[in-house]
């Protein structure tokens, strides 16, 4: 089993979970800052946005998680802020981040569609890295299986939880996000292939589809009244993405992303 603490200096402990999230953040900021000027948004605007959005997204992700695990946290109030032990919900972070983005664009008079198109691939890449934090913490795993011989030994060992090998759903989602990132990065280079907003719509459809399937394999999903919350949110993302694309394609005068 991998030690969840990457580095310890006196009372200060740096967790792998935090390093995975921060690594994803750094990559996301780099990618977005390189792409932003092509759509008339300065790199400084990206940095300013991240300084506001990232901490709020972490808080939002934690609140989302705590709400749906309230039966536990109401008895352990001191653990509510212990995010270093895991327990942040991606959808909570995404929803918070999207709301902050809309508010930021309104305040700075920026086109939110352009901003969302720039952010989407960057977020996908960050998620691909961030999921490895779940691997270290032995969370976001799937059902018990007899063996995992198709995986490297270090993954097999870390996925041996509570006396059984577990489906590495974190790995499936990480790979799915990475594949989606590669596809959209290649696609957006093709002239007149994507309208403004369709990169963001692709993210909604792609991530929603993958999460909808993968969530069904998990055993530690957040539940509400016996329902897997993330599957319903995923289905909603897919529907929103499809409706968005259909409406954009029917509208006249919508610019191509590459213009």
From Swiss-Prot:
Its EC number is 2.5.1.145. It is a multi-pass membrane protein. Pfam families: LGT (PF01790). One of its GO terms (biological process) is lipoprotein biosynthetic process. Signal peptide: none annotated. Keywords: Cell membrane, Membrane, Transferase, Transmembrane, Transmembrane helix. A 1,2-diacyl-sn-glycero-3-phospho-(1'-sn-glycerol) binds at residue 131. It is found in: Cell membrane. Pathway: Protein modification; lipoprotein biosynthesis (diacylglyceryl transfer). The chain crosses the membrane at residues 12-32, 41-61, 80-100, 109-129, 167-187, 194-214, 226-246. Its main location: membrane. GO terms for molecular function: phosphatidylglycerol-prolipoprotein diacylglyceryl transferase activity. It is an enzyme of class 2 (transferase). One of its GO terms (cellular component) is plasma membrane. Catalyzes the transfer of the diacylglyceryl group from phosphatidylglycerol to the sulfhydryl group of the N-terminal cysteine of a prolipoprotein, the first step in the formation of mature lipoproteins. Belongs to the Lgt family. This is Phosphatidylglycerol--prolipoprotein diacylglyceryl transferase.
